[in-house]
Amino acid sequence: MAVFTQVTHDQAQSLLDHLQLGQLTELKGIQGGIENTNYFLTSSEGEFVLTLFERLSAQELPFYLHLMRHLAVRAIPVPKPMENDAGQILFEVAGKPAALVNRLKGASELQPTAQHCQIVGDMLARMHLAARDFELSQPNLRGLNWWIQTVPQILEFLTPECSQLLLQELAFQVDLSAQPVFKSLPKGAVHADLFRDNVMFDEDHLSGFFDFYFAGVDTWLFDLSVCLNDWCIDLKTGSFDSQRLHAFIKAYQRVRPLSASERELINPMLRAAALRFWISRLWDLHLPREANLLKAHDPQHFERVLKARIFHPIHIEHILGY
C-alpha cells in the first residue's frame, strides 16, 4: 500500500456523507505496497480502509469488489465493500476510482509458525471453494501474458547472469502453459498475492484476508504456490521450512484434495509463482512511479526463491503420505 494521490479531509467526508457513515475523525496514509493509494479512515461510525485505484480501470474493478462481497457473504473473512442506498460499491475520490471497506481487526503475522500456516492453508482452500460459483471472470492481470510483455522492458537493467536465468525460466513457463496437463489444472477466482502482510490475525484467530486487487481467474495451484513461497520459507535464503510447508499443504489438502495434475505440477508452479514476483519487483524497482510513502521491494529475494525452487524441488507425495 502507498500514497500516490493526496486525499483531503473534505473529499473523504464527502464519501462518508454519500455512504451515511458519520463524521470523519482521522485520515492517515498507509505505508507499504506498490499499486494503489490507501488510507486508514476513521469516522464516528467505525474504522475503514479507503483505496484509490491508480492502475486499474473502472471497467476492471467490479471483479475485485464483487469478489470480496461474494466471499464475505459466504463467511470467508475478507473486507466487505461499503455500498450506498443503490447498492453501488465503486465511487470516485480525487478524480480516481475508489472503494471503502471495513478495516479488519488485528495485525499481520510476519513470523508465522506452523500453526499460522495451518490456519491460512485451511482458509485458502475454503476461499477457493467458496468462489466456485462467482459469476464474474477476469484473467490474472499479472499472469503469463504480462510476464512476456514486461521482461523485455527490464532486461537492460540486469546482469547477463540474471537476464539468462529470467529468459530461461520464462521460456520454461511458456512451454509448460502449452502442455495438456497444465490445461487440466482446476481454475477459479484466486487472490494471487496472499503474502504474510495480506492476512490479519487477532491473537491466534484469523481475522481476514485482504488486498484482493491482484485477484483474477487462474489455477488454484498457482495461488497455493504464491502462499507457500512466502508463508513457508526462510526469508534470508528462500528455502522451505519443512514444518511450515507440511502444515500448510496438509491443511489445504484436508479441505480441497489436490488433483493428480496438481501434484504433478506443483514444482513447476512454485517456480512460476517465484518468477511472477521476481518480474514485478524488478519492474517496480527499475521503472518506478512517484509516490509518497512508496517502498520498492527487493527483487533479489525472489531471485533467491526461484533458484531454491529450481534446485530443491519438494516431494509432494511424501508430504501427503501417498
Briefly describe each language-model feature range.
Residues 1-85, 202-205, 318-322:
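Conserved NTP-binding catalytic cores of kinases and kinase-like/nucleotidyltransferase enzymes
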Residues 7-18, 135-136, 148-192:
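An alpha-helical support segment within catalytic cores of ATP-dependent transferases
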Residues 110-164, 185-187, 293-296:
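A cross-family kinase active-site recognition segment
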Residues 31, 36-44, 49-50, 81-82, ...:
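Active-site acidic catalytic loop and adjacent metal/ATP-binding pocket
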Residues 152-153, 277-322:
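ATP/Mg2+ or Mg2+-diphosphate-binding catalytic cores
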Residues 221-257, 272-288:
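Active-site activation/catalytic loop segments of kinase-like enzymes and analogous catalytic loops
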Residues 98-111, 149-157, 275-292:
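A glycine-centered beta->alpha junction motif in the catalytic cores
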Residues 43-136:
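ATP-binding pocket architecture of kinase catalytic cores
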